[in-house]
Amino acid sequence: MSNKSEAAILKNLEKLAVHNDPIDQKLYSQYDVKRGLRNANGTGVLVGLTRIGDVVGYELKDGQKIAIPGRLVYRGYNVEDLIKDADKNKQFGYEQCAYLLLFGELPNQAKLEAFSNYLGECRVLPANFTEDMIMKAPSNDIMNKMARGVLASYSYDDDPENRSVSNVIKQCIQLIARFSTLAAYGYQAKRRYYDNKSLFIHNPKPELSTAENFLRLIRSDKQYTRLEAEILDLALILHAEHGGGNNSSLTVHVVSSADTDTYSAMAAAVGSLKGRRHGGANIKVMEMMDDIKANVKDWTSEKEVGNYLKNIATKEAGDRSGLIYGMGHAIYTISDPREVLLKAKAKKLAKEKGFLEEFALYDLIEKLSPAIIQEVHHSDKKICANVDMYSGLVYSMLNIPRELFTPIFAISRIAGWSAHRIEEIVSGGRIYRPAYKNISKEREFVPLMDRK
């Protein structure tokens, strides 16, 4: 079939789909459909219970949302306390965070060392995996490559269908350990086969943290500073878990409830996170910032920056979506604790890397945006910057290319996904089966030879 013929066929099929699939938006209100599993007041529909993580941004009083400063809680502990403890002991904290999410308890020093050593031993991919599953089948999209890598791992597992808790824990720990390697090698394959650049394949070092190993694997000289590794470690901690209701974690629960294998569940979660509405938000922030920097002459002028932000909010500038990316969150109202913690460390990195002028622009946008959004939308809803406002800037200062931004999210969130899979199995939940109402009328069948 020629390309022209295929295009014509697909165009006709597209017309049918566009004509027959749309649903009158009024019907969603008529049938009280909780679109996106959201209630009318913006809160999420309660579909499950979890002990793993909690996202706190408001309190409910008489059915009304009352804004409060945001908190991110892992297994009952405020994440800010975990980070402070790691800083105090001059340790990287992601591994301790992963242990806590998986097993529900804070490890002592001996348990943490044993767990970190186990992760280190698991970072190396199976024999021939790199050559056969990554280099021989590169992808221009690293999240796509990671999903394929997860599914391919099934074939390298001696007992992939064993869904005992101990075996699932083993599978999850191996995936947590290997995600940074999968992402880094997928990136190197893309560089070689799609970007025509030099290929560097370094072996992970078992004694290094997840953050250190990742920086080592993506850089040709394998070098990084302590501050660089610390801020990446912080980003990994802050993205590791966000409650059971976020799209990718819910995906893990839904797919796991069907009693499938670990690799299928995790690949589905990667597919969810790959979506532009979920894992790609910090890239949208960076694209918006590129546009602002190109069109605003004086980055220090509140008037000039504010006027351009208003043009973005009124769909007269930027990508014409009307969104000031990096602002607002479904749950956080007064503050996103992840943004607060990452911003503080980002300023230190900006000073080291010579990015203070750019950091000040981000800070000004964060300051001006809430009032502009409220003015344009005639709303008094409280709006705060979210973690995506600064995460992209942090990765850029680390000289990490944008195609790795969402994979870093996955490297972090695999710990939370693993905890949710184990929780779903241990809790023995039923298969997810929500309702969909069919609104089509029944029609009289027309035999093939009688159709026009």
Task: Describe each PLM feature range.
Residues 1-452:
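Non-transmembrane, aqueous-exposed alpha-helical and coiled segments at domain scale
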